[in-house]
């Protein structure tokens, strides 16, 4: 190859390499951080007073991801407390429940140890309910200051209700309302009922494989590995999702949201494994049935009729014991453990028609 051809080849190679680096850098940046769309009018102009941000907040010494969205920045604040632990539900909420952003300022918080809020540097001894309560309190402080509110509403799902109730007891003055979805009540009793349902169902339909594995696992208490095996059969029998749903389906739906990226995918399993194992022992001891029945704010318990993850009947038993300024219980007849995603239209309508007026009344009275 002549010197001239060599120089041309080098220039082309270097040029392509630089272009590839730029493309990769752009992809990594977008892939890591994602974006959340602005609220715009019919002419494409950003609606005055709306809010649509993605940010990182240092809560309890750990950087955590928060998406804040609302068509009206003066609307009541609602914070989602996702399940798991370690399960970022931002994409699912954005897909199924984004209409709530027209009525609330909705805060999608990715808790410490979950997804993009996961880091190898998080001390395992900070993965405690008390720390999640402290993180939430710090987040609420930021939101109250930024939006000029005295109170917010928290909506917990599954694990989110474990520390959600703990927060209601520690800082009732900050809450306009508490909403528990798939409420954790008494973890030990819930696990016992969940296991028995799964074994009974396996025997009813004569599923030999399920019977054999469940009998080998035996009744709780047991470790996380056995919980996950029991949950797999629970899902197959409609006790986790009324229509059995695969993790692939959930992830596919979740990652349609612009806020969710390849970075979230990379962080998903490490964060979930870390969170589940770190919190398993303490979460197994949760007993709000005996430890938290008095609330100083309105309480809403929303249960899927077929929920055998956090037993639906146990949720209703808990509701019956609750003392609060006002309380409501709602059955979702076509759901198991996740009414927001299994019956989104009914779930959204309930929050708008039943929860919002209560919250607005408290806000008008100084909340």
Q: What are the functions of these language-model segments?
A:
Residues 75-84:
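Short beta-strand element of the alpha/beta-hydrolase
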Residues 205-290, 294-297:
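Alpha/beta-hydrolase
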Residues 170-222:
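A catalytic-pocket lid/entrance helix-loop region that shapes and gates access to the active site
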Residues 90-91, 113-127:
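Glycine-rich "HGGG/HGxG" loop immediately N-terminal to the catalytic nucleophile
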Residues 88-97:
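The serine-hydrolase catalytic nucleophile loop
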Residues 131-151:
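Conserved acidic catalytic loop of the alpha/beta-hydrolase fold
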């Amino acid at each position: 190859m002549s010197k001239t051809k060599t120089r041309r080849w080098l220039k082309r190679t270097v040029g392509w390499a630089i272009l590839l680096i730029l493309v990769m850098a752009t992809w990594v940046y977008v892939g890591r951080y994602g974006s959340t769309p602005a609220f715009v009018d019919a002419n494409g102009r950003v609606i005055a007073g709306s809010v649509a941000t993605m940010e990182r907040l240092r809560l309890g010494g750990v950087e955590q991801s928060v998406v804040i969205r609302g068509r009206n920045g003066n609307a009541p604040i609602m914070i989602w407390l996702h399940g798991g632990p370690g399960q970022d539900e931002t994409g699912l909420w954005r897909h199924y429940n984004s209409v709530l952003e027209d009525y609330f300022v909705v805060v999608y918080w990715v808790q410490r140890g979950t997804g993009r809020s996961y880091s190898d540097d998080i001390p395992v001894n900070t993965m405690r309910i008390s720390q999640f309560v402290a993180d939430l309190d710090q987040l609420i402080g930021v939101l109250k200051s930024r939006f000029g509110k005295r109170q917010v509403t928290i909506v917990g799902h599954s694990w989110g209700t474990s520390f959600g109730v703990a927060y209601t007891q520690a800082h009732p003055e900050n809450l306009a309302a508490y909403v528990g979805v798939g409420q954790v009540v008494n973890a030990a009793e819930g696990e016992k009922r969940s296991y028995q349902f799964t074994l009974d169902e396996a025997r009813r339909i004569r599923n030999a494989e399920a019977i054999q594995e469940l009998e080998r696992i035996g009744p709780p208490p047991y470790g996380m590995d056995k919980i996950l095996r029991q949950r797999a059969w629970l899902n197959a029998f409609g006790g986790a999702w009324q229509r059995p749903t695969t993790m692939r389906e959930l992830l596919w739906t979740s990652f349609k949201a612009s806020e969710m990226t390849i970075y979230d995918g990379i962080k998903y399993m490490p964060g979930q494994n870390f969170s589940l194992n770190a919190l398993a022992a303490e979460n197994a001891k949760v007993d709000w049935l005996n430890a938290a029945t008095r609330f100083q704010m309105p309480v809403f318990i929303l249960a899927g009729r077929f929920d055998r993850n956090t037993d639906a009947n146990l949720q209703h038993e808990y509701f019956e014991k609750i003392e609060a300024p006002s309380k409501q219980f709602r059955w979702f007849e076509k759901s198991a453990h996740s009414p927001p995603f299994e019956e989104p239209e009914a779930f959204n309508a309930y929050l708008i028609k039943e929860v919002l007026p209560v919250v607005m009344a408290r806000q008008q009275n100084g909340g």
